[in-house]
Amino acid sequence: MKKLLFFCFSILCVISASAQYNITVKIYGFKADTLSLNRFDFEKNKFLVQQNLPYADEVILKGKKSLAPGYYVISADSMDMAAFFISDEKNQKFQIEVWNDMKQFSGSEENSAFLSMKAREKEFDNRLKVLDNEFAEIQKNSLPQYMKQTMVDSLVARAKRIMGEKENYMRELMERYDGTLFASYVQSQLQLPEPPQSCYGNRDLYNIFLADTLLANYPWHDERFLATPFAHNILADYMKVIFYMPQNEAVPRLLKNLRAAQVNETQLYAVFDYFEKMFGSLTSPYRDEKLYIPMLKQMLEYKNLETGRKARYEFELSTIDKNNEGDILPDFPMLMSTGETLSLHQVPAEYMLVYFQNPDCPTCSQVREKMKTMTHLKNAIASGRLKVLTVYFESDESLWRRYLTQKANPDYLHAWNYTLSIETDNLYDTRVIPMMMFVDKDKKVIRKDIPYNDLEPLIQKLGLSK
């Protein structure tokens, strides 16, 4: 029995020892107050401090628990001294030496390879810069054009050979360090294909090319890659390209990559959450329901979707997937500033801007002030072709009546949804106000939730300001 207990105790000791990290950091010729170990956090998009110690020329960073896989930076005060990958709970005992711009790892093969790769990348870049300089010299000289073209063709061939060497080198690294986070990083850095000639001078075609290629080398299989700034940077670049593309081009490409992420559920949820924050958040400058709604619909079809996420996505979809362009706005009763009681559909107008607001909301007030200065808006109202209807939809009647006497624009119509049906019946998404809907004579939506800075261009496009 004692032997068995001793054996179990020994096993526990071994497991405990294997779960620790022990990183010796030696820095030569540098002074600071503190040395910190920082790990990248994908959700917060920044490095978070894991450990802080007083600075010394030699410091041992250690802990009883192993470091989570990810990308780490060691900083002396605010100066980054070294970066490294952690791939698993093993091999967390190594040494880093830093002097001037030189660094060296002992006991960590993948991080030694990381440093070597950076050095080789500089070599490749320097060789390409030589070709750039040669090209500049060719452009300056007075040789006949056919001779210049021959020389340029030679430079292009040499550049392709260099890029081919780099590609082969990186693929060899991927194979040699297969299974490590470093290998996934190398995969993400593989050279993207050159854009076709048709993309030059055509921004729309170039964006389509980028949307098709930016995530081509993304390591969807490796959830550890999320704990690196490289993942966030790639996804941020992709998000901006998608945002500025036409909807019919953007949506299928966005959904295709979200399907690709399904090979790893952790990746899927993290990447979806990131795009949801960008395209679905009420405060995001990249908010776009035309992208967000298809995302939600596709995720609700994912067979392994977590119950909590399913409930949230269904609620979100029920809130925003209505009053879309081409839909007829739902009717609701209103008390007008004149004392009449009408419904929205009873107000005749060739075009109407329905302005949902709270009179005391600071942003609502700011937008109203900006609208006062809009020449095309004022001309369209004066022509009789456009009516602006402000709608208060909350319960404080006295607040609305003060607004009528103190702040209301006499050129607008003003109404209160006195039955509060807008909110109780969930007719509109009024979580962020002001919220403006531009509709035609049938109350059919032309623009949903239109930003104020898009008002004047739309009025001009419709020819209402003449």
What are these regions (language model features)?
Residues M1-K26, S465-K466:
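Bacterial Sec-dependent N-terminal signal peptides
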Residues Q20-D178, Y185-A211:
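A non-transmembrane, solvent-exposed segment enriched in polar/low-complexity residues
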Residues Y72-S75, V432-M435, D440-K466:
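Non-catalytic, surface beta->alpha helical segment in thiol-disulfide oxidoreductase systems
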Residues N248-I328, K466:
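N-terminal targeting signals for export/organelle localization
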Residues T307-L344, P410-D411, P457-S465:
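N-terminal "domain-start" segment that seeds a small globular fold
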Residues L342-M371, K387-V391:
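Short active-site neighborhood of thiol/selenol oxidoreductases, capturing the structured segment around
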Residues S365-T405, S421-T424:
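Structural microenvironment flanking redox-active thiols in thiol-disulfide oxidoreductases
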Residues R401-M437, K441:
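Short, internal strand/loop/helix patches
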